[in-house]
């Protein structure tokens, strides 16, 4: 074993402390010896009572170790031979207890400071132990060591011989050697590991240091460890644990081996289990282990700070015949550290929790039938939400939220149980809802619709208590409550544009078959209900027709209902013409609006109606040739007009004065007041005139009626007629510039052929154009026209728009901006459903209601655009 020794500032302290054990030398001699290492090694005198032993001859620190044979009766115990090493580290002296039959000799040499810093060949200590010595005379050795294992555990550089050789032969000498790592090696510590061989079957100990079991209970082991160097100076001040494994015999007196080192300072402050396991050899005797273990080395600092299980498992070889104990717990069970305070370890027991499963028993509410009732499907309920049965006779429905349906069907005590024996009742209640609904029965044969939210429809059909019970015994009643209204639907308008549908079921429809009708095809009657409703909106009579058609039923669980909405003025598809004076820029705008409501699904149980509204919108522009009046030959009027346009060529121009205001009605609001809709605003009142119809216009508009965002548009000959580009980049064709109409628009425009309802919100011109040229179809553009001075304003007698009469003829001619329809349903909280859908345009505050059928959910996607003919 190589011993490291380093001089330090504590040399004088060590010299004063160990003055009685060393020869007196000078301070500089000790310093020189500490720097260069001891070159002379003299064997220490053996104790007087010790027999003559053959000491182990050892070369200086820088020479290989040569050892002489050791007799089997005289094991050698190493003692320091260099006195200056004792000066450097007084605690590293080996104390040999005299024995009557044992002798120990220790040979040690030390290395210098440089060797210790950089590592080199240090001293070697060897020992030989005999297995024949009585355990009562085993000497105790107190030689600290930071790296060296005991005589029974060789270091990592010297593999041990087989354990059987160590047990049977008394003359076998183990020479554990370890190369010194130097100061840095001592600072970070080293760990040795070697495989061991046990006599037993426990082979899990191959990772731990070797442990040689003793062959006899009386065998004693003398553990000799060495240490020194700078790590030992501080560790001498703070005695700690050994970082090397310790081998002890459990039947012999306790052999305490303690090693100190710099890495063990924190270990001493926080005692814990050894990071390098000790190795103990236990016999089958019941001697408790009192092995003192300790750890060290830089890797062990954290483990010493937080005491826990050893990072390297300890190993012990037990000769028990019964079973192999856990080797990692046999050594550290009764271990006590050399310094610090021991922290006991308490076992932590875990508790397991058992879960108790609940068993729901079968309900006994279905046992009302006495003998032969089938009851195969009671209750065959397939709702999308929760079903909570109650004891009331009529179904009670409680809405639980959007998209959910709560159906509480119960079995009537008088209606379902009248058939005592043969009523199968296989479908009570066969409810397959497809939408969320709140169903509240209102009485025999009546239906109440209570909507539960936006877009939801609630139908509450009930079956009369007398209608189901007419068939006393043999009615299977497979359709209860498979109820689809087949009687007359009573449609009662409840307000402006709202329709309340309260369908009722005739009590004689289902009950004509008294006994044998299982009612598998009920209802098969599909009446067509048409209701015409006329109301006045802003003084304009409006007629709306609701048509309900029930197609043939192919399945008793699904039924389709078609709802068509018709506006007067041309039937289901209507056209309204708005006509202006034919002298200037005749233009016909034809708009077709088709509104259909197909695919109304009825679920028999939940009575859910889903209606899809399809809106088809088309418009066509027919520009006629502009007459030459006021266009050609107008060069002498206030300058030259375009003059280059002949028949078949016409243009649109801008007007800045805004004097051509219709006189047939009143205009109010911001902007220029022009019913055309100027950039700053639009007409904010009602404009009516002597045209072929009337128009209600009110509201706000962020642009012109045409969707442009700038000035009014004038025909040729008016002031402002030139080749200038529009100052706003907009166009009545729907320029993509700023100021396009935004918001919602609705209104009723009454033309020659009827009335129209325009609803919805608009963003952008409904013409959809994006150019700056105001050219009617068929023209190539007017940018290449000569720059002409336009005609003066409307007060010119020769102009086509020269007086109020001319402007007056165009009083009620307006095209409302295009709108995008998004159906919005507003439901009151009454029992009678008020299904109302409103759209508001930018040009009017008129609210038009979309009529809905029973359970009709109106969802529109498309454009509602005013239809008409515009003459400009």
Swiss-Prot record:
Biased amino acid composition, Acidic residues: 196-207, 317-328, 366-376, 624-635, 646-659, 780-808
Biased composition (Gly residues): 666-692, 701-710, 731-740, 761-771
Gene: PGA25
Region (Disordered): 43-383, 492-517, 623-809
Induction field: Up-regulated in biofilm, in oralpharyngeal candidasis, and upon milbemycins A3 oxim derivative (A3Ox). Down-regulated by fluconazole.
InterPro entries the UniProt entry points to: DUF3246
Family to which this protein belongs: Belongs to the HYR1/IFF family.
Major localization class: secreted
Identification of the protein by name: Probable GPI-anchored adhesin-like protein PGA25
Role played: Probable GPI-anchored cell wall protein involved in cell wall organization, hyphal growth, as well as in host-fungal interaction and virulence.
Lipidation (GPI-anchor amidated alanine): 845
GO cellular component, one term: side of membrane
Keywords: Cell wall, Glycoprotein, GPI-anchor, Lipoprotein, Membrane, Secreted, Signal, Virulence
Ranges annotated as biased composition (Low complexity): 43-65, 84-110, 125-171, 208-225, 242-260, 274-293, 349-363, 741-760
PTM field: The GPI-anchor is attached to the protein in the endoplasmic reticulum and serves to target the protein to the cell surface. There, the glucosamine-inositol phospholipid moiety is cleaved off and the GPI-modified mannoprotein is covalently attached via its lipidless GPI glycan remnant to the 1,6-beta-glucan of the outer cell wall layer.
Glycosylation sites per record: 92, 290
Keyword Hydrolase: no
Signal peptide range: 1-19
One Pfam family, short name: DUF3246
Prosequence residues removed at maturation: 846-872
Subcellular location, record wording: Secreted, Cell wall; Membrane
Biased composition, class Polar residues, residue ranges: 66-83, 495-506
Membrane-topology annotation of the record: Lipid-anchor; GPI-anchor
């Amino acid at each position: 074993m190589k011993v490291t020794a380093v001089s330090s500032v504590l040399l004088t302290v060590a010299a004063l402390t160990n003055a009685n054990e060393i020869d007196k030398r000078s301070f500089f001699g000790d310093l020189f010896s500490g720097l260069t290492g001891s070159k002379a090694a003299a064997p220490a005198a053996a104790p007087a009572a010790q027999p003559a032993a053959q000491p182990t001859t050892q070369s200086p620190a820088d020479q290989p170790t040569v050892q002489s044979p050791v007799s089997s009766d005289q094991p050698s115990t190493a003692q320091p031979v260099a006195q200056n090493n004792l000066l450097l580290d007084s605690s590293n002296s080996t104390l040999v207890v005299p024995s009557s039959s044992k002798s120990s000799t220790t040979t040690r040499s030390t290395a210098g400071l440089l060797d210790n810093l950089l590592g080199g060949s240090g001293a070697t200590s060897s020992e030989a132990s005999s297995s024949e010595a009585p355990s009562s005379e085993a000497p105790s050795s107190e030689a600290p060591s930071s790296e060296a294992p005991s005589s029974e555990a060789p270091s990592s550089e010297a593999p041990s011989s087989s354990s059987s050789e160590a047990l049977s032969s008394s003359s076998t000498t183990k020479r554990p050697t370890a190369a010194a790592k130097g100061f840095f090696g001592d600072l970070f510590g080293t760990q040795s590991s070697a495989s061991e061989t046990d006599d037993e079957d426990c082979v899990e100990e191959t990772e731990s240091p070797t442990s040689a079991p003793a062959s006899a209970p009386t065998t004693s082991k003398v553990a000799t460890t060495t240490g020194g160097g700078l790590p030992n100076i501080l560790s001498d001040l703070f005695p700690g644990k050994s970082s090397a494994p310790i081998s002890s015999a459990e039947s012999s007196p306790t052999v305490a081996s303690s090693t100190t080192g710099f890495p063990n300072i924190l270990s001493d402050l926080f005692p814990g289990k050894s990071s390098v396991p000790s190795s103990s050899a236990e016999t089958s005797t019941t001697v408790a282990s009192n092995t003192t273990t300790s750890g060290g080395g830089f890797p062990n600092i954290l483990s010493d700070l937080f005491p826990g299980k050893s990072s390297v498992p300890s190993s012990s070889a037990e000769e028990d015949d019964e079973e192999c104990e856990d080797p990692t717990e046999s050594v550290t069970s009764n271990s006590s550290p050399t310094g610090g305070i021991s922290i006991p370890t308490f076992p932590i027991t875990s508790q397991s929790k058992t879960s108790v499963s609940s068993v729901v028993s079968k309900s006994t509410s279905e046992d009302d039938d006495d003998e032969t009732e089938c009851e195969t499907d009671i209750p065959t309920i397939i709702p999308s939400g929760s079903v909570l049965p109650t004891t009331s006779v009529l179904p009670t429905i409680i809405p639980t939220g959007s998209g959910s349906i709560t159906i509480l069907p119960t079995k009537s005590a008088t209606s379902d149980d009248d058939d005592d024996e043969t009523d199968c009742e296989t479908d009570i209640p066969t409810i397959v809802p497809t939408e969320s609904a709140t169903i509240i029965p209102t009485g025999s044969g009546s239906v109440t619709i209570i909507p539960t939210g936006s877009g939801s429809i609630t139908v509450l059909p009930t079956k009369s208590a007398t209608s189901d019970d007419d068939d006393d015994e043999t009615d299977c009643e497979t359709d209860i409550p498979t109820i689809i209204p087949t009687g007359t639907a009573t449609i009662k308008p409840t307000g402006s544009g709202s329709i309340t549908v309260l369908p009722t079921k005739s009590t004689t429809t289902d009950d004509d078959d008294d006994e044998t009708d299982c009612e598998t095809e009920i209802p098969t009657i599909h009446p067509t209900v048409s209701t015409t409703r006329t109301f006045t909106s802003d003084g304009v009579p409006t007629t709306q027709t609701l048509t309900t058609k029930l197609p043939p039923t192919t399945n008793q669980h699904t039924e389709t209902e078609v709802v068509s909405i018709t506006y007067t003025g041309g039937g289901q598809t209507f056209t309204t013409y708005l006509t202006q004076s034919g002298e200037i820029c005749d233009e016909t705008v034809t708009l077709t609006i088709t509104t259909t409501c197909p695919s109304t699904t009825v679920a028999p149980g939940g009575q859910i109606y889903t209606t899809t509204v399809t809106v088809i919108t088309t418009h066509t522009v027919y520009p006629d040739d502009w007459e030459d009046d006021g266009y050609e030959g107008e060069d002498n009027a206030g300058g030259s007009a375009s003059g280059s346009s002949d028949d078949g060529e016409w243009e649109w121009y801008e007007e800045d004065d805004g004097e051509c205001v219709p006189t047939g009605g009143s205009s109010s609001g911001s902007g220029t007041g022009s019913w055309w809709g100027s950039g700053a605003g639009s007409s904010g009142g009602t404009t009516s005139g002597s045209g072929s119809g009337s128009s209600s216009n009110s509201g706000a508009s962020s642009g012109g009626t045409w969707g442009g965002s700038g000035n009014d548009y004038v025909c040729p000959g008016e002031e402002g007629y030139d080749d200038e580009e529009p100052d706003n980049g907009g166009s009545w064709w729907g320029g993509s510039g700023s100021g396009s109409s935004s918001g919602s628009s609705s209104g009723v425009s009454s033309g020659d052929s009827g009335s129209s309802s325009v609803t919805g919100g608009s963003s952008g011109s409904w013409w959809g154009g994006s150019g700056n040229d105001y050219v009617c179809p068929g023209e190539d553009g007017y940018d290449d026209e000569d720059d002409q001075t336009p005609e003066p304003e409307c007060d010119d007698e020769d102009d086509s728009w020269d007086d109020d009469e001319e402007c007056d003829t165009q009083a009620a001619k307006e095209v409302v901006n295009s709108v995008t329809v998004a159906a919005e349903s507003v439901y009151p909280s009454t029992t009678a459903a008020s299904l109302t859908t409103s759209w508001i345009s930018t040009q009017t505050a008129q609210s038009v209601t979309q009529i809905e059928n029973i359970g009709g959910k109106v969802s529109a996607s498309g454009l509602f655009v005013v239809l008409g003919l515009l003459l400009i």
